[in-house]
């Protein structure tokens, strides 16, 4: 059953990302979530307003504005990110990670500040997010089933960009190294990240320390950065869970344990 709910949450979040889909709140055990807004006052996420705030993003560009053809022989740029570092001081200096682990973080990850600057930079350079299914199509003909590049219709002066998030699993080892711990669908229908401050052990929900809700907010504030509501793609391996939810069974956990017995196989042949 836990596999089903995690996969359902994954599907909802991927759909939200592909179709357009901070603040800080203390998680509640009840049905309500109280969010602290930018003025410091508490607001109830529960609302009867059924208007999707990202409708404006999806409908920002009208068809008559898409006058630039981007053909199959032209490059569609791709940026991919591993989980971003929420607490760089902790990750690079104060946690118990080895020096090699810190080098790995520096090689493969970016901090929240770096990520925000990258988004602003590609936006300023005229890139626009496009959905992968608009870039490629699966076709079946007499030669079989294969993928073909499509011609994109873009606003004049824009360049297509695909963003993907790799390893959106929130591995257990990362929880001690200054990262957020899972993605949560809030009562407002939007994606939040759960985070524990490594210095205070306070656990809270945030939209400011994780790549997914940061991109959500950036697109919401810059609707011209997205074509038809496109945002990012999740790359899920399923290893050690999905989106911060542990879906592996006891056999998987035992196989990952450094204390697992080592079996030696010998040949019975003379």
Which stretches of residues belong to each language-model region?
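N-terminal hydrophobic targeting signals that begin at the initiator methionine
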Residues: 1-2
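Terminal accessory/targeting
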Residues: 5-10, 14-263
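Conserved small/polar residues in nucleotide/adenosyl-binding loops
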Residues: 265-269
């Amino acid at each position: 059953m836990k596999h089903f709910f995690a996969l359902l949450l994954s599907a909802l979040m991927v759909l939200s990302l592909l179709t357009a889909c901070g603040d800080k709140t203390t998680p509640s055990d009840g049905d309500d979530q109280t969010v602290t807004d930018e003025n410091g006052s508490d607001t109830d996420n529960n609302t009867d307003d059924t208007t999707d705030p990202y409708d404006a993003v999806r409908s920002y560009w009208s068809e008559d504005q898409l006058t630039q053809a981007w053909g199959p022989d032209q490059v569609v740029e791709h940026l991919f990110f591993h989980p971003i570092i929420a607490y760089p001081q902790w990750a690079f200096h104060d946690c118990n990670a080895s020096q090699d682990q810190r080098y790995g973080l520096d090689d493969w990850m970016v901090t929240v500040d770096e990520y925000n600057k990258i988004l602003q930079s590609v936006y300023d350079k005229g890139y626009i997010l496009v959905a992968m299914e608009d870039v490629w199509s699966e076709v079946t003909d007499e030669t079989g089933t294969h993928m073909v590049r499509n011609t994109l219709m873009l606003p004049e002066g824009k360049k297509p960009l695909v963003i993907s998030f790799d390893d959106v699993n929130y591995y257990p080892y990362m929880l001690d190294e200054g990262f957020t711990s899972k993605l949560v669908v809030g009562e407002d229908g939007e994606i939040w990240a759960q985070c524990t401050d490594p210095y205070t052990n306070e656990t809270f929900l945030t939209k400011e320390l994780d790549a997914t809700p940061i991109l959500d907010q950036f697109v919401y504030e810059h609707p011209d950065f997205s074509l038809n509501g496109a945002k990012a793609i999740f790359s899920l391996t399923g290893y050690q869970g999905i989106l911060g939810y542990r879906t592996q069974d006891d056999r998987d956990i035992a196989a990952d344990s450094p204390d697992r017995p080592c079996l030696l196989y010998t040949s019975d042949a003379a």
